[in-house]
Amino acid sequence: MGARASVLSGGELDKWEKIRLRPGGKKKYRLKHIVWASRELERFAVNPGLLETSEGCRQILGQLQPSLQTGSEELRSLYNTVATLYCVHQRIEKKDTKEALDKIEEEQNKCKKKAQQAAADTGNSSQVSQNYPIVQNLQGQMVHQAISPRTLNAWVKVVEEKAFSPEVIPMFSALSEGATPQDLNTMLNTVGGHQAAMQMLKETINEEAAEWDRLHPVHAGPIAPGQMREPRGSDIAGTTSTLQEQIGWMTNNPPIPVGEIYKRWIILGLNKIVRMYSPTSILDIRQGPKEPFRDYVDRFYKTLRAEQATQEVKNWMTETLLVQNANPDCKTILKALGPAATLEEMMTACQGVGGPGHKARVLAEAMSQVTNPTTIMMQKGNFRNQRKT
């Protein structure tokens, strides 16, 4: 509790304990509310140290606000507590939680108007958000919007449900869009089990970091005034760099996209893990005699994602093996379509292959190819002399 008590100084704590939970109510904020908020933030994988400053509280509020409409009562209580704490840090006198929330809303409206005005002045409405989650605050500084609990929960749920099947990689890529190395480490740290897989991932990251250092040796001499130091492999992995340094590299001119570089290393490691969890080779994926073409394509692409190959090689695998390993019925149709056929055309053409409707059509075509003379002979011999005397 001692560490959490340091969130407020003595004078601030006095002000905190004078604020009522509800307008006209008797209950007031106590130290236990800060302790509870810290624990809740830890549960959401958010650094509780952010509660110690007004800027940190602002970041937490920005992170929680999108979830308020659909969030639980605990989430609303956490938002209210942080909003009140923000006002105490800012030395804004408030009697209760509602007044604190009104103040937050007022500041957010002002911020929105200034952002809209700035966008109108520059003629570029995307200027504020183009580097999200790194955004520009009212003072013109580039600040970081921490990864949201909703994103973290989605990531944890994917790993729990899918383990490390191939679809985990595109999901990780989507959820970590624009993330800093700190965000990426937060995502990795939320994975509770699968420690063997996480150790493999760590080894891959260390290998890539060492390779980065080999290809990007440190320049001799002092750093020029106003310039940032060059990131080392461990900086990119977020172990020896601060969040401010990461933001600086990512927003510098020209930028060094440490987040994207680290993300590539992680995806490389995830590919190795997926390969271990899904040992089936793409060469082994063949369409069963009665398997619908759609199901075969699903299995094919799921395994293809786990293949450790360049995109060019994967394209070749798709163009060659998808047709080559189809069952005879589908293969005949696909070869007739030609090599330029799209996947949509293939799936449309092979729809229903193997089913009773397809078999009936094949039988009808075979019957239509019977020569006319044979048909006539069969008709001439209609039931003649069938009854023996």
UniProtKB/Swiss-Prot annotation:
Keywords: AIDS, Capsid protein, Host cell membrane, Host cytoplasm, Host endosome, Host membrane, Host nucleus, Lipoprotein, Membrane, Methylation, Myristate, Phosphoprotein, RNA-binding, Viral nucleoprotein, Virion. It comes from the Viruses. GO terms for cellular component: host cell nucleus; host cell plasma membrane; host multivesicular body; membrane; viral nucleocapsid; virion membrane. A motif (Nuclear localization signal) lies at residues 26-32. Residues 14-33 are annotated as: Interaction with membrane phosphatidylinositol 4,5-bisphosphate and RNA. The record marks 132-133, 363-364, 377-378 as: Cleavage. One of its GO terms (biological process) is viral translational frameshifting. InterPro entries: Gag_p24_C (IPR045345), Lentvrl_matrix_N (IPR000071), Matrix_HIV/RSV_N (IPR012344), Primate_lentivir_Gag_pol-like (IPR050195), Retrov_capsid_C (IPR008916), Retrov_capsid_N (IPR008919), Retrovr_matrix (IPR010999). The keyword Lipoprotein applies. Capsid protein p24 is phosphorylated possibly by host MAPK1; this phosphorylation is necessary for Pin1-mediated virion uncoating. Residues 7-31 are annotated as: Interaction with Gp41. Residues 8-43 are annotated as: Interaction with host CALM1. Residues 217-225 are annotated as: PPIA/CYPA-binding loop. A motif (Nuclear export signal) lies at residues 16-22. The keyword Flavoprotein does not apply. The modification Phosphoserine is found at residue 148. Residues 277-363 are annotated as: Dimerization/Multimerization of capsid protein p24. Signal peptide: none annotated. Residues 12-19 are annotated as: Interaction with host AP3D1. Belongs to the primate lentivirus group gag polyprotein family. Isolates WMJ1, WMJ2, and WMJ3 were obtained from blood samples sequentially taken from a two-year old Haitian who was perinatally infected by her mother. Gag polyprotein: Homotrimer; further assembles as hexamers of trimers. Oligomerization possibly creates a central hole into which the cytoplasmic tail of the gp41 envelope protein may be inserted. Gag polyprotein: Interacts with host TRIM22; this interaction seems to disrupt proper trafficking of Gag polyprotein and may interfere with budding. Gag polyprotein: Interacts with host PDZD8. Matrix protein p17: Homotrimer; further assembles as hexamers of trimers. Matrix protein p17: Interacts with gp41 (via C-terminus). Late-budding domains (L domains) are short sequence motifs essential for viral particle budding. They recruit proteins of the host ESCRT machinery (Endosomal Sorting Complex Required for Transport) or ESCRT-associated proteins. p6-gag contains two L domains: a PTAP/PSAP motif, which interacts with the UEV domain of TSG101 and a LYPX(n)L motif which interacts with PDCD6IP/AIP1. This is Gag polyprotein. The lineage of its organism: Viruses, Riboviria, Pararnavirae, Artverviricota, Revtraviricetes.
